[in-house]
Amino acid sequence: MAHKKGGGSTKNGRDSNPKYLGVKAAGGSTVSAGSIIVRQRGTVFKPGNNAGIGKDHTIFALIDGKVSFRNGRNNKKQIDILPV
C-alpha cells in the first residue's frame, strides 16, 4: 500500500491575459493619423468619416484631427475624425 496520498487534481488555476479593450481617445480629443481610438470585440462602434477599421474591429484615425462620436444606424455609435 502507498504510504503517501496521490496528488489530487484541480479544475481551477487558469486565468486569461487582460485584453485592454475600450475607448482609447475620448470625444473632442486630438489624434494623429494611425492612432487607435477604440479596441473592441465585434462592432460596438462603427467607423465614420476619416476613420478605419482593422481586422480585429479596432477603430483608428486615417487623418490628424479631432475625435467625434455620433449615433449611427442600428443603435451603433459612429466615430468620425474632424480635420483641424
UniProtKB/Swiss-Prot annotation:
Please list the GO biological process terms of this entry: translation
Q: Which domain of life is it from?
A: Bacteria
Does the keyword Metal-binding feature in the UniProt annotation?
no
Q: Which GO terms describe its cellular component?
A: cytosolic large ribosomal subunit
Gene3D superfamilies found in the cross-reference section: 2.40.50.100
Annotated region Disordered: where?
1-22
Entry keyword set = Ribonucleoprotein, Ribosomal protein
Q: Name one GO molecular function term.
A: structural constituent of ribosome
Any matching Pfam family: Ribosomal_L27
Ribonucleoprotein recorded as keyword: yes
Q: Which HAMAP family match?
A: Ribosomal_bL27
Its family remark reads: Belongs to the bacterial ribosomal protein bL27 family.
Q: NCBIfam families in the record, alphabetically?
A: L27
- Report what the protein is called: Large ribosomal subunit protein bL27
State the organism named in the record: Prosthecochloris aestuarii (strain DSM 271 / SK 413)
